[in-house]
Amino acid sequence: MRSAQVYRWQIPMDAGVVLRDRRLKTRDGLYVCLREGEREGWGEISPLPGFSQETWEEAQSVLLAWVNNWLAGDCELPQMPSVAFGVSCALAELADTLPQAANYRTAPLCNGDPDDLILKLADMPGEKVAKVKVGLYEAVRDGMVVNLLLEAIPDLHLRLDANRAWTPLKGQQFAKYVNPDYRHRIAFLEEPCKTRDDSRAFARETGIAIAWDESLREPDFAFVAEEGVRAVVIKPTLTGSLEKVREQVQAAHALGLTAVISSSIESSLGLTQLARIAAWLTPDTIPGLDTLDLMQAQQVRRWPGSTLPVVEVDALERLL
């Protein structure tokens, strides 16, 4: 016997969260809970404003229609990426095919005063990998901050993300201030320039490895080995079903590329599932999941070690 529930939720964000020049005051999304006999599976559907093509209202409409079809015996996945991902997670939990083991290691997102960051990063246990957003300020400033961190902590490796912010000139201004001796400790720089060709040229000219992120979701993208390209950053909420995520990871690994499972600012429930997906598909790579502290609460499932308050399922709005 099948049953299901859909929950709508909204989490207040910290004041400083800006995405694509838009301040994100709340994170809005949906959960689907599927039950069959004694088994239960959950999934999160939370399109990311400015990045997802669909709104959460559109996702809600598609999700509710899919749930009704599922209750009637139809299991075909929807095409909308955020819904396909959430539904496929719920089905995988229901079928017990999403492993419980999770990779809760994170590459901490660095912002704020560089002196404070140096102290924090120097105390990190184990492999020191951190992430820095670049492209929000002047490229010269970004280069100086990155150089300072790499100089101060000799065993630190940085993942950088420019979100296609730079022209070729700005990319060169950034690189000018990063000591060539430190550049090999930049694990990768996600999408430095506005076009893929400019990003490729940046990698060739600077020796700084790049990663594809937004490019993966463009219709003309193909997985090929290229000089200077070291990684792909896969955001399942923006990608689609678990099967599509797995196909992308396998395509990357076949070319010797690092595949990084990364957050689209999901709630704690979604983040814990991403940690399980990372342990399953990319066990040797630290995922990019350090976004929970951008929110003011956890929901339904806790992230280990987080002190944020937890909103239980009974407090969420039911849609069925």
From Swiss-Prot:
Its cofactor is a divalent metal cation. It comes from the Bacteria. It holds the Pfam family MenC_N. GO terms for biological process: menaquinone biosynthetic process. This is o-succinylbenzoate synthase. It catalyses: (1R,6R)-6-hydroxy-2-succinyl-cyclohexa-2,4-diene-1-carboxylate = 2-succinylbenzoate + H2O. Keywords: Lyase, Magnesium, Menaquinone biosynthesis, Metal-binding. Pathway: Quinol/quinone metabolism; 1,4-dihydroxy-2-naphthoate biosynthesis; 1,4-dihydroxy-2-naphthoate from chorismate: step 4/7; Quinol/quinone metabolism; menaquinone biosynthesis. Belongs to the mandelate racemase/muconate lactonizing enzyme family. MenC type 1 subfamily. Converts 2-succinyl-6-hydroxy-2,4-cyclohexadiene-1-carboxylate (SHCHC) to 2-succinylbenzoate (OSB). HAMAP family: MenC_1 (MF_00470). GO terms for molecular function: magnesium ion binding; O-succinylbenzoate synthase activity. The active site is at residues 133, 235. Its EC number is 4.2.1.113. PANTHER family: O-SUCCINYLBENZOATE SYNTHASE, O-SUCCINYLBENZOATE SYNTHASE-RELATED. Mg(2+) binds at residues 161, 190, 213.
